[in-house]
Amino acid sequence: MHDQTLTGGQALVRLLAGYGVETVFGIPGVHTLELYRGLPGSGIRHVLTRHEQGAGFMADGYARVSGKPGVCFVISGPGVTNVATPIGQAYADSIPLLVISSVNHSASLGKGCGSLHETQDQRAITAPITAFSALALSPEDLPELVARAFAVFDSQRPRPVHISVPLDVLAAKVARDWTGEVRRRPARGPAAAADIQQAADTLRKAKRPMIIAGGGALHAAEQLRALSTRLGAVFFSSVAGKGLLPDEAPLNAGATLCVEPGWQLISQADVVLAVGTEMADTDYWRERLPLNGELLRLDIDPRKFNDFYPCSVALHGDARATLDALLQALPPTPADAGAAIHAVADLRQAVQNGQGPLQQIHRSILQRIAAELPEQGFIASDMTQLAYSGNYLYPTRATRSWLHPTGYGTLGYGLPAGIGAKLGAPERPGLVLVGDGGFLYTLQELATAVEELRSPLVVLLWNNDALGQIRDDMLDLNIEPIGVLPRNPDFAALARAFGCSVSQPASLDELQQELREGFARNGVTLIELKHACAR
């Protein structure tokens, strides 16, 4: 008679299902077999990626679009080091990511036995880029560690968590059935009443109030729109906050704090309210914003209140709950927004007039994309010049619709993140914006996309046959360009080999037609746009 007692690996999978996990990304290996024993019948879909970096980026894209934690399974040693870059990206951008990995037998840890996939201290590898990295020393440690992980995702600044499980713990029989011990205790509430009142008093007296909102405010779009209207306040977003206000809203200055007109406008504010943003230089393309007024900060992470820009009022709490309370504390009559609306109109015109030749090409491409991307569509972008322009030029229609690796800035993000986003929201048409350099980092994940996706995903490959940004930076610094003009493969042939539909438009009109057809076609379409064809 077979023993029906669950192994640690089986029980862990069932526990994750209880937490609402529906999809995991990964590659099975000899050290994770017990995890895979638990998948059949669990209700969890496994997505086979072609590299652990792809697994991590897919989990990131899944989380950004769905708002739920992305989960991946990786093997000990090389699996962990391969997924470290996506973990770092998720850490920088505050994305909820749960990485479950194996690790060598408990008795061998730290002894340098030369075991397969051995590292000196696997937990320490990811500790600096996670909310916490933990080692499960028994199956009974696992429910506590998973509960801690979801406490981070639900109640704190959502950052990655890594749990290493030794081989013997994965294979061990559980002493009791803890698979139903799901503990989710969201504890986010409003800031202290006295702080909210102080902020309301400051904002009520402001002559030129402005708002900056980021990824920590994605669930508070309605409140931010109401607050901007109530105060007559110019509204800026970070790249992660794109879509919080409708692009056409007259007070919406968008993600323009990375260009001169945005810097000039924010410098005129006498009070700035920053909501759910760390106000980092990766959003602003300069070390510091020219803030001349009083700064109020609302954040779930109290460590942000004195980072870079110390604030006069610190609102420690959930963005939505705190903004609801702040709106209650403010006068109900909207302030006169005429001057602010005029200032935003001037900013928009200045941004359009201030584009250099390359940015004008980018703008033309982005306009064609905006004309064809369905209203509910999303864009996952890589670190490429076209996306840098799109960060502030592209008219994002809703939150969770522009996915960009802002903080860590890694190449190779766009394609796997777009695949993960499609799996997190299969009903939404998706577009990947990627340059030829970044595409080569993770193009093998086209195999995953073709295998898994049944609805439209368009990959727009911006091919200038160069590491364009680095080449331009070298030239700006009077450095002779070296290592920036690679010999690229035949991308169209590669994509066809993976099973993609492929087109190579020769003009922007053809690009728009190919985009239209791609969004109407189920599966993966690669559109390779050469720089010369976009002029």
Segments the model singles out, each with a brief description of its role:
Residues 12, 17, 27-40, 344-427:
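Active-site diphosphate/adenylate-binding microenvironment
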Residues 213-216, 276, 382-384, 529-531:
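Structural motif
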Residues 1-3, 140, 178, 291-383, ...:
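Phosphate/pyrophosphate-binding active-site segments
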